[in-house]
């Protein structure tokens, strides 16, 4: 690693099965983008790659490697030669990959054929930024070991995926389980929300952009209960938080709705200031 932007971490698809020990799943915030990057280089979908916040990454190949970059639309060059989005590239020893800053989207993924083979913790190579479990965030000077290439080979050179935009996002959510704690839970689905600058891998915090406020009808707080990926928790401020990859496994604020699993990746790519609305499904 020659240079690291705001944050770069090693991520795979997480460490499920440890909730009873107080450990969350973590893993890639945008799982679809990591899976795609791995498929492009012929890896199993859950192989560890690099998750880059906004961009600013620079790395040098120490030997021949096959790489793919997916997710946010950060410009990528290899020895100053532009690399297309969601495409496969062969890098030779000494070649330099530079990633600029994304114009749209928030997180970019770099997969290397063979996967990043840092030491696993509880069965996963993912960094959990809430608990501190897993490999440290990447720093300049880090040398990343690459695993043995799989027997399967890449079958395409590029994946035709739509570019992420800065337009209004529509996110599907199921009401409940604590919708009855609110005077009008339908207010969540009315008007628009804006992604707050106070957003990270733990959760996407939202500010009201237009529409009615969320008002509680039940005073006090809940006994601590389990929290799931995509839970929309509402603290006393009335500003909802959509729980992302590194979310706490328990919480005491009511969950007004749960974002469907397929749309959690969309929320994880939403930039601060971007408009968002919830669409109710049953």
Question: Residue spans of the language-model regions?
Answer:
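Conserved "landmark" site that anchors the functional core of diverse proteins
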Residues: 1-282
